[in-house]
Amino acid sequence: MKGMRLMPMKMKAKLVVLSVGALWMMMFFLVDYAEGRRLSQLPESECDFDFKEQPEDFFGILDSSLVPPKEPKDDIYQLKTTRQHSGRRRKQSHKSQNKAALRLPPPFLWTDDAVDVLQHSHSPTLNGQPIQRRRRAVTVRKERTWDYGVIPYEIDTIFSGAHKALFKQAMRHWENFTCIKFVERDPNLHANYIYFTVKNCGCCSFLGKNGNGRQPISIGRNCEKFGIIIHELGHTIGFHHEHARGDRDKHIVINKGNIMRGQEYNFDVLSPEEVDLPLLPYDLNSIMHYAKNSFSKSPYLDTITPIGIPPGTHLELGQRKRLSRGDIVQANLLYKCASCGRTYQQNSGHIVSPHFIYSGNGVLSEFEGSGDAGEDPSAESEFDASLTNCEWRITATNGEKVILHLQQLHLMSSDDCTQDYLEIRDGYWHKSPLVRRICGNVSGEVITTQTSRMLLNYVNRNAAKGYRGFKARFEVVCGGDLKLTKDQSIDSPNYPMDYMPDKECVWRITAPDNHQVALKFQSFELEKHDGCAYDFVEIRDGNHSDSRLIGRFCGDKLPPNIKTRSNQMYIRFVSDSSVQKLGFSAALMLDVDECKFTDHGCQHLCINTLGSYQCGCRAGYELQANGKTCEDACGGVVDATKSNGSLYSPSYPDVYPNSKQCVWEVVAPPNHAVFLNFSHFDLEGTRFHYTKCNYDYLIIYSKMRDNRLKKIGIYCGHELPPVVNSEQSILRLEFYSDRTVQRSGFVAKFVIDVDECSMNNGGCQHRCRNTFGSYQCSCRNGYTLAENGHNCTETRCKFEITTSYGVLQSPNYPEDYPRNIYCYWHFQTVLGHRIQLTFHDFEVESHQECIYDYVAIYDGRSENSSTLGIYCGGREPYAVIASTNEMFMVLATDAGLQRKGFKATFVSECGGYLRATNHSQTFYSHPRYGSRPYKRNMYCDWRIQADPESSVKIRFLHFEIEYSERCDYDYLEITEEGYSMNTIHGRFCGKHKPPIIISNSDTLLLRFQTDESNSLRGFAISFMAVDPPEDSVGEDFDAVTPFPGYLKSMYSSETGSDHLLPPSRLI
């Protein structure tokens, strides 16, 4: 790994000659230059300590001699016992335990037993001898220690979710072995706090508490390692570097000749006025110690050499893996942690007070009744009087609660339990709400916190009289009901470690009236699956499992910001038995609609966002720099009532910009139409009848009087579009460019013409179509135009086709078709399926624009539907497929040349577009539903769409699909398109009908896929349009201000396909 230089050498050298004030700052702001540089000198195993891949605890990949033993299920932490082979418990005095546990050859091997003994020991000993006072590298200034051992923190938003998880892992590591508590900062409680950020110093932090409010702890490039963060937190807690102790020369040799020039000051010794003097020896294994080659001229030259280390000793000088034994004891002494107790971070465990497990005869005692055991003098001799004040800290993740089962308690009774007691608080410190204070004889109590932490303070001054204390069991549960009165966080179970298998958590959050619940994910990493069938987070607008689904999320992509429409939110987290990931961390916030309750000052539109609002503009305008007023932009409303004119793409004749969106509406006088003729056209892409314009494109609509947009066409490439005209008096153009290729754009001239069809239908019996300077009449299906050009007569060449497959051909095929005929074929298949038409032979009189003889195919029930293609000549068209369950085809010939016509086959395919209306409709999994099972290897997509102001509701009438545990074989998957990402409603299989589903938007997407094996009956689904819940947006509230003309068009064909688009609809 490549190291990073954190500060120029000259700058570092100047630090030693600065003013007295600068020296004072240097004393308390530690720059760990070595932490960034040393990474290039460490073995890969030390540099890349992968904390996530450990099976269960922090020590999973360490040397076996340093691995603490697993905690037994019945964890009795305060007093360890040995077991004889007979299985009986053997009594052992507390003093002898201390001696046995501390007779360890250097280096000291850290185990839970050692921690336990050191925490209990009243007089620490080594090899049976008291530890002498020696200098220890912790701050001597008591005001620099954090009050009550509570260190509030905030994390800069520049860090990723993985970084935030790593910071929390390091903080939990300190908490696990000390009484120090790292808590998320509450501005109302915590004036001083640390702030994880990035400074120019790279890896650096203040020594202890600064006392001036926000206190940075810099985790820069190459510093984001688990051990390095523990090291920097050590400085924050109050630790100097270990090698800066005054007695260090008795334990190490500083090889000054090997130190980089200008970096010698990093090895200076601190004065006695700067360090405390606890009762601990020099610690070569401290995480606060430099490595042997820190600031070395060369990786092969040592700057630090230990003294008197026996050959073969495993020494980890400068290790950045974990706290050493000495680090832990030193921190507990510095913060005056209780002589007994510990921190629990697991999901369940047992807590037993000192003395409880022994009676006078050395056998585990289960006292009964209310008798007083103080009369047993033999018991008194076994008790250590120093173990009368203990503190246990149970720490869960945000969104979890702690349940304590108090199995037995035996303490001296007193009024209000003022003498001896067990005090339980809902939180992390003495100011947290008091839940219970208990004394006397109690059993069977159950106590639950409302937060994710529980604090137990235990006082038993009369233990020597036989009051044995208590025994309890705790468990951590996730989910529950939350009353949201201020911002708070929820995390997946065990976060920031991997969540556990087979876990299900449900949170029901309720905000005050006139508020909404907002959710913002800060970290997200779940097992990935297309249908989120394995591990997922499901969010609903309400407080129960059948409330409106907002989204189901999995994978590692951060979900969008989410806000409910009501004042309640339902969050469900599920994990399966296989893959576990980091999980998630999210912030819950109260939110109000600022557009309703504040003077927003937006000139045009106000758009509510998460915790704020944004202003937007109407079509043809752009938001100015002040964020409130709007100005003219590309596009706009063009008044064509007085003269003709031209439209140009942005920047023409230069190339148009990237990421541009423009909307024009050309408005003609009443009873007039707009005609548009292109003289130049050059956009990215190639527009053929079998391709789509996916990059840059121009869409043209005819805007109807009721605001419906009827699509005329979408165009890209370099071929000139045909002359187009509006059906009524408004023509709408929408231009879009992406972020890549740019072209020269387009020029189009518009002219205004009287719409002859607007008066008395132009005299046409059936239909009138306006043309430039004139008009044309046409007839409905089954009729042909009479010689007078206005009236219609019935034709006999018409075919209504309702079968699911077949063959068709033109009249007289393979001979020449007749002259002057008008034939049509109307295909109609089962709802939810569509017709695919394939030509096998095709020969129709040729013309560049097919104005003589032609075959025209329409996507719907008549010629008024969208055109799929108009064909002539001798080339077989590509296969044509409708988007709905109807297709209309016309063969029209004139009095001139004749050809043999065509032969084609048609087949009904699943999928397509479905228009949801106020009336319930039903579609099926396959055309022959009810008589035959569905086919193998099917792949079907349906798009069910309602009007823009409505939602889609689907209900399953029958459901029978091959079952598999993951729905991997045959399945129906239901999603909907969102502004930033798709929402997954679920993947279904088996024989149980899925629940009713109501979309958040106006569209639902259904995908039915089957494999090559078993086939069952299939499904039947009814669908209809319904009113959505009260107005609000349930997806991404950090969206940027919409582009001018953000009233993005929606379109479908005549099969109930023209969509109403009122000006208030935001797409």
UniProtKB/Swiss-Prot annotation:
GO terms for cellular component: extracellular space. GO terms for molecular function: calcium ion binding; collagen binding; metalloendopeptidase activity; zinc ion binding. It holds the Pfam family CUB. InterPro entries: BMP_1/tolloid-like, CUB_dom, EGF-like_Ca-bd_dom, EGF-like_dom, EGF-type_Asp/Asn_hydroxyl_site, EGF_Ca-bd_CS, MetalloPept_cat_dom_sf, NOTCH1_EGF-like. Its cofactor is Zn(2+). Its EC number is 3.4.24.-. Binds 1 zinc ion per subunit. Residues 591-631, 753-793 form the EGF-like domain. Disulfide bonds join 179-337, 201-223, 203-204, 340-390, 417-439, 478-505, 532-554, 595-606, 602-615, 617-630, 634-662, 693-716, 757-768, 764-777, 779-792, 797-823, 850-872, 910-940, 967-989. The active site is at 232. Residues 37-136 form a propeptide. SMART domains: CUB, EGF, EGF_CA, ZnMc. GO terms for biological process: amnioserosa formation; dorsal/ventral pattern formation; imaginal disc-derived wing vein morphogenesis; maternal specification of dorsal/ventral axis, oocyte, soma encoded; positive regulation of activin receptor signaling pathway; positive regulation of BMP signaling pathway; protein processing; proteolysis. A motif (Cell attachment site) lies at residues 245-247, 325-327. PANTHER family: COMPLEMENT COMPONENT 1, S SUBCOMPONENT-RELATED (PTHR24255), CUBILIN-LIKE PROTEIN (PTHR24255:SF31). Metalloprotease which cleaves TGF-beta family ligands daw, Actbeta and myo in vitro. Cleavage of daw enhances its signaling activity. Cleaves dorsal-ventral patterning protein sog. Processes sog more efficiently than metalloprotease tld which also cleaves sog. Required for normal dorsal development. TLD may interact physically with DPP-C protein. Mutations in TLD lead to a partial transformation of dorsal ectoderm into ventral ectoderm. This is Dorsal-ventral patterning protein tolloid. The lineage of its organism: Eukaryota, Metazoa, Ecdysozoa, Arthropoda, Hexapoda.
